[in-house]
Regions:
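Glycine-enriched alpha-helix->loop->beta-strand junction motifs that scaffold or abut catalytic
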Residues: 94-98, 138, 160-165
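Hydrophobic faces of well-ordered beta-strands that scaffold small-molecule active sites
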Residues: 39, 73-75, 100-102, 139-143, ...
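Active-site beta-loop-alpha junctions enriched in small/polar residues
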Residues: 44-46, 78-80, 103-107, 144-146, ...
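Aromatic/hydrophobic pocket-lining residues that form the small-molecule binding cavity
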Residues: 58, 82, 125, 151, ...
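Auxiliary Fe-S-binding modules of radical SAM enzymes
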Residues: 147, 151-235
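Conserved strand-turn element in the central/C-terminal portion of the radical SAM core barrel
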Residues: 118, 128-151
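Conserved Radical SAM active-site core
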Residues: 1-99, 107-110, 122
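A structural motif corresponding to the C-terminal end of an alpha-helix
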Residues: 64-71, 127-139, 206-226
Length: 235
């Protein structure tokens, strides 16, 4: 049926075209929280997407987590709106192992405008990572999905902002990855139109990963891609 988490067929058939909110998410969370849990929020849907500014779901969710903290809470986003909740996040980091994974996809803002036209500029995202870090929040600059970039410069910027090891993943589209998390098919069209097809090729992606790993090592850090990398968020 492919109907997951209370969603209806139209919700996933038109993925990315609108937002469906679970308005009672914080209430449901309060019922299910336990001290031994590792919670990842959220590998598929950004909790700080633009509509969150109006809906204000995350302050209620963070309030529930502060009242009954899990063992680990990992928060995945690319939205500068996270800074709105800096106070609750700082409180939560005193109670649990809070990790923020903040997506930095390229060092080239013209590429960001091609693939992520509605997302914040790269410079602003790097500044968010610095702000979270300076607030004492364990923050990873996550190179995912890896868009066309200068790998060495991207690694330098990410490590400079976060002061931590890096995690990430190549750009996957359903045409070359039959299972698991992928970027919308529009990315395939953008890549073809802009001459970036090689960035979808697994062999070329492996070459880029090696360059990222090498630069991270040169700067005294490490890089891990895919499940082994994201597993760092739950340790």
């Amino acid at each position: 049926m492919r109907v997951q988490g209370g969603l209806q067929p139209e919700d996933w058939r038109h993925w990315g075209q609108f937002t469906t909110f679970k308005s009672n998410a914080a209430d449901l969370l309060r019922r299910e929280l336990r001290g031994d849990q590792r919670i990842y929020c959220s590998p598929l849907v950004d909790p700080y997407q633009p509509a969150e500014e109006r809906e204000r779901m995350m302050p209620r969710i963070l309030e529930a987590l502060i009242a009954s903290p899990p063992h680990v809470f990992a928060l995945q986003t690319r939205g500068p709106l996270i800074l709105r909740d800096l106070g609750p996040l700082r409180a939560l980091t005193q109670l649990t192992r809070l990790r923020v994974s903040f997506s930095i996809t390229t060092n080239r803002d013209e590429v960001r405008r091609m693939y992520e036209p509605h997302c914040a500029p790269i410079a602003e995202r790097l500044e968010v990572v610095r702000t979270l870090r300076n607030a004492g929040i364990e923050t990873y600059a996550t190179l995912a999905p890896l868009l066309p970039c200068d790998p060495e410069e991207l690694v330098r910027l990410a490590i400079e902002a976060s002061g931590r090891d890096l995690i990430g993943d190549p750009l996957h589209v359903r045409g070359v990855k039959p299972r698991g998390a992928t970027t919308r098919g529009a990315a395939f069209q953008v890549s073809a139109a802009r001459g970036h097809d090689e960035w979808l090729d697994p062999v070329f992606q492996e070459h880029v990963i090696r360059r990222v790993e090498g630069q991270a090592k040169t700067l005294g850090r490490s890089f891990a891609a895919g499940p082994s990398g994201f597993a760092r968020l739950s340790v």
